[in-house]
Each structure stands twice: as structure tokens, then as C-alpha cells.
């Protein structure tokens, strides 16, 4: 464990910044015998490594280079650093929003590819931090196994998605039928192979560090892959369940920044000193108003409200349906005090607008805690941003730290309060059954509908 003892850049056991010698250690000798090394390992196993003793032992990650385009640097060279950063963030934000609108126009399949691309980049940024922190140890197979586990977990989650939403397409392909039928076993076998490779890669002098990074990889997978899978599940419920939550988080991020930039005086949380109560409160009200208006606009169009379905006859995704009651105007009675102010007793709203208030409230009150969590993580490793992918913003993970928390909430919200039985999904499951099973279900359903009076009894001749 001697390598871990020197990780913070200490020159040696007696150098500046070195921890005091513990019981059983030589206090100043350069030569260590085999028995002394074994004794250190035993002490480390009982009391823990020096890693857990404080942030001072955590090595700093090398700072990222500035990727701001030269044309922007020249145009903003006369401004103070505060206003220069404001303009860079603003220009890049408008650029990203424009590209996002373009991808929305291109359809749900491109949105799914975007989510997968963001997932891979976020995983890369978090894993790279771990690799930079421990790069001097040359851990065997660390990066290879990390990407292998990413592949395995994606195969597990998205194989389930293919089985659920592409059943009619799978029926036409014999090879895919095998993969879908034994999907979970194949997923487990792939993961087990990676697990065995990890065990075989263990090296005595790096045991503890290798298990640290094994846990690091799995927590990263939990944060990125699981949440991106939930985002795509939300998208299949209808593009509106994807757009309103994501745009609410973006709106909160922008408006909280603007309110904090111009009016911020009172610090909000120590983890993120630049966050202020003024920005937090201003972002909350702005986000609720934005979400309510966005829900009204998007609820008018089938393209946004219909569940995303794969149609085998046209070999593409379609968003055509009769909108549910959630997206049909209804009259709501106003409270008495509003009736007096507005001189009307009722107001026409889409029911989804009521749900949008819950989504916007979560995005503005709880969503920022995803950002605070990320700030704590970055402080622990003494870094400013996860990466320097986007000038003025940092890495992709810096932009989506709140989105992952939002995705989980939306999925839980849909399954708890919105989703009912899906006839299309039930039909797809029926189509993959054996003919005898389909006939039994048909007879049972016919008897049930006849007993309820929906079907007329069949007269026997």
C-alpha cells in the first residue's frame, strides 16, 4: 500500500505533508523488509487507507484547457472576466437551444440517439476524472473494463426496450427473436464475463484501489445509463413528457443564472457559493410560468402528445393517435376570489397543464440539488468542471446533472399518476404467443365481453 501512502505528492515518509508514522511502521528508514510491507497491508485492512482521511490527500486533477473559439476571445477581449463569461455562456446557450430545436424537428428517433450520445459522453467524463486522479498507478484493464460494463448495461436496458416497443419488427427476424427470448440470460452472461475479467486483473499492490474504481464504474453506470433509459421510456409516452421536463430544467438553469447575476446578494448553499436565494426564487417562479405556457402550446399538437410507436408497415416511428383526455381542453371552475378579479367563473385548460405545475416545481425546487450534488463531487476532486467540452459551461455532465434527477421523477410520476394499460403494447405481447394460447385468450375474452353485454350471445344452429 506504499503507493497510496505517497499519492498526495509527498516526497517520502519523512517529507512535507506526510502523515505521522503509525504503530508498527519504521519512522524514518528508507529500507523496508517484506514483513514490514505485509504488516502495513494488515494495518491498512483494519484501519482503512489514507484516502479516507480528508480532501487534502486527494490528488488534484490536471486543469482542462480553454476551448473558447478564438473569434469569441477577440470579440470579447475588452470586457471584464465576469461579463466575458456571461456573453460566452449566452451565445453557446442559444446555439445549443437552436440545435435542440433542429433535433426535435428531425423526430423522436434522433432524440433517442441524442440521449444515447449524451449518456456515453457523461460516462466518459466521469470515468476520465477517475482515470486522471489515479493515472500514475497504471491500473490493469481499468478503462477497457469500464467501457465493457457500459456496453453490457446498455444491452440489458435497451434490449428490454426493443422487446417492449419493437415486437412486430422482431417477429420478422429470426436472429432477433433468439436475442430477445434469451435477452436476460445473455445480459447476465456478458456481465459475468466482465466480472471474471476484473477478478483476474487484480494485482496485489493495487487491490484496494482497483475495488475503488470498480465501485466508481458501477455508480457511474447507475447515474448515466439508468437515467438515460428512463428518459427514453418517458419519450415513448409522448414527446411532451420528454420536452416539458427537460425544457423546464433548462429554463430554471437560465433564469436562476440571470436573476442571480443581476440581483443575487444572499448566498444559497456553501457547496456552490455563486448560487443565491434571489436566483433560486426567481428561477422557481419563471420555471412554473414557462412550464404552464409550454404545456398549453405543446398540448395542441398530436406530434408532441401521442405516444411514440414503431410501425412495421412504414418501418419508422409514428406519432398519430386520438389525443387522450389529458390533452383535451376542459373547463375548470375558478376560486371565488379569482372569479371576482377575472369576471368569469370558469377557465379552459388542458389537464396536462395542471401536471406541468408539478413537473416545473420539481425542476426548480428539487432539480437544483442534482447540481449541488455535482458541485460537491467536483469540490471533492478539486476540479472546476467535469470537462471543457462546451466553453463557458464546462462538460456535458455539467449541463445535465439536474436532468438525470428530473428523468427519474418524471418516470415515477407517469407510472404513479398517469399511465394506464397500453392496448398497443398488450396487442404486441399477444402476437408473440403460440396460436393455441392466442385462441384461448380469444375465447376467454369473448365470454367475458358477452357476460358484460358488450357482445351479443352467439346462437347455436
UniProtKB/Swiss-Prot annotation:
Residue list for modification Phosphoserine: 35, 37
Annotated Basic and acidic residues bias: 22-56
Pathways involved: Phospholipid metabolism; CDP-diacylglycerol biosynthesis; CDP-diacylglycerol from sn-glycerol 3-phosphate: step 3/3
Reactions performed catalytically: a 1,2-diacyl-sn-glycero-3-phosphate + CTP + H(+) = a CDP-1,2-diacyl-sn-glycerol + diphosphate; 1-octadecanoyl-2-(5Z,8Z,11Z,14Z-eicosatetraenoyl)-sn-glycero-3-phosphate + CTP + H(+) = 1-octadecanoyl-2-(5Z,8Z,11Z,14Z-eicosatetraenoyl)-sn-glycero-3-cytidine-5'-diphosphate + diphosphate; 1-octadecanoyl-2-(9Z,12Z-octadecadienoyl)-sn-glycero-3-phosphate + CTP + H(+) = 1-octadecanoyl-2-(9Z,12Z-octadecadienoyl)-sn-glycero-3-cytidine-5'-diphosphate + diphosphate; 1-hexadecanoyl-2-(5Z,8Z,11Z,14Z-eicosatetraenoyl)-sn-glycero-3-phosphate + CTP + H(+) = 1-hexadecanoyl-2-(5Z,8Z,11Z,14Z-eicosatetraenoyl)-sn-glycero-3-cytidine-5'-diphosphate + diphosphate
MF terms (GO), sorted A to Z: phosphatidate cytidylyltransferase activity
Bilayer topology term: Multi-pass membrane protein
Omega-N-methylarginine carried by residues: 7
Binding partners and assembly: Homodimer. Interacts with FOS; this interaction may enhance catalytic activity.
Protein's name in the database: Phosphatidate cytidylyltransferase 1
Amino acid at each position: 500500500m506504499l503507493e497510496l501512502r505517497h499519492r498526495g505528492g509527498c516526497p517520502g515518509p519523512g517529507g512535507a505533508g506526510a502523515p505521522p508514522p503509525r504503530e508498527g511502521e519504521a519512522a524514518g528508514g528508507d529500507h523496508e523488509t517484506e514483513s514490514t510491507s505485509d504488516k502495513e497491508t494488515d494495518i491498512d485492512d483494519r484501519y482503512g487507507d489514507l484516502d479516507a482521511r480528508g480532501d487534502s490527500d486527494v490528488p488534484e486533477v490536471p486543469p482542462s484547457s480553454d476551448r473558447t473559439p478564438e473569434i469569441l476571445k477577440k470579440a470579447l477581449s475588452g470586457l471584464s472576466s465576469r461579463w466575458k463569461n456571461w456573453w460566452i455562456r449566452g451565445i453557446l446557450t442559444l446555439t445549443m437551444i437552436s440545435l435542440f430545436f433542429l433535433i426535435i424537428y428531425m423526430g423522436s428517433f434522433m432524440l433517442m440517439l441524442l440521449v444515447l450520445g449524451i449518456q456515453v459522453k457523461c460516462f466518459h467524463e466521469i470515468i476520465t476524472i477517475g482515470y486522471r486522479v489515479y493515472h500514475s498507478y497504471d491500473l490493469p484493464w481499468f478503462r477497457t473494463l469500464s467501457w465493457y460494463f457500459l456496453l453490457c448495461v446498455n444491452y440489458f436496458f435497451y434490449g428490454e426496450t426493443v422487446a417492449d416497443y419493437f415486437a412486430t419488427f422482431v417477429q420478422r427476424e429470426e436472429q432477433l427473436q433468439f436475442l430477445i427470448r434469451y435477452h436476460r440470460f445473455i445480459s447476465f452472461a456478458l456481465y459475468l464475463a466482465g466480472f471474471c475479467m476484473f477478478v483476474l486483473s487484480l494485482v496485489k499492490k493495487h487491490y484496494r484501489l482497483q475495488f475503488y474504481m470498480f465501485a466508481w464504474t458501477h455508480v457511474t453506470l447507475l447515474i448515466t445509463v439508468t437515467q438515460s433509459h428512463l428518459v427514453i421510456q418517458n419519450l415513448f409516452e409522448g414527446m411532451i413528457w420528454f420536452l416539458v421536463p427537460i425544457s423546464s430544467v433548462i429554463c430554471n438553469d437560465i433564469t436562476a443564472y440571470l436573476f442571480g447575476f443581476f440581483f443575487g446578494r444572499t448566498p444559497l448553499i456553501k457547496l456552490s457559493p455563486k448560487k443565491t436565494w434571489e436566483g433560486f426564487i426567481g428561477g422557481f417562479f419563471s420555471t412554473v410560468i414557462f412550464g404552464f405556457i409550454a404545456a398549453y402550446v405543446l398540448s395542441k399538437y398530436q406530434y408532441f402528445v401521442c405516444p411514440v410507436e414503431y410501425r412495421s408497415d412504414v418501418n419508422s416511428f409514428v406519432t398519430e393517435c386520438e389525443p387522450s383526455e389529458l390533452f383535451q381542453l376542459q373547463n375548470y371552475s375558478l376560486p371565488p376570489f379569482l372569479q371576482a378579479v377575472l369576471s368569469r367563473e370558469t377557465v379552459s385548460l388542458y389537464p396536462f397543464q395542471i401536471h406541468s405545475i408539478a413537473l416545473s416545481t420539481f425542476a426548480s425546487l428539487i432539480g437544483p440539488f442534482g447540481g449541488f450534488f455535482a458541485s460537491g463531487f467536483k469540490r471533492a476532486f478539486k476540479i472546476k468542471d467535469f470537462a471543457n467540452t462546451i466553453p463557458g459551461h464546462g462538460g456535458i455532465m455539467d449541463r445535465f446533472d439536474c436532468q438525470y434527477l428530473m428523468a427519474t421523477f418524471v418516470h415515477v410520476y407517469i407510472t404513479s399518476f398517469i399511465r394506464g394499460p397500453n392496448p398497443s403494447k398488450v396487442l404486441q405481447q399477444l402476437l408473440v404467443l403460440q396460436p393455441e394460447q392466442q385462441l384461448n385468450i380469444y375465447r376467454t375474452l369473448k365470454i367475458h365481453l358477452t357476460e358484460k353485454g358488450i357482445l351479443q350471445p352467439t346462437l347455436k344452429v
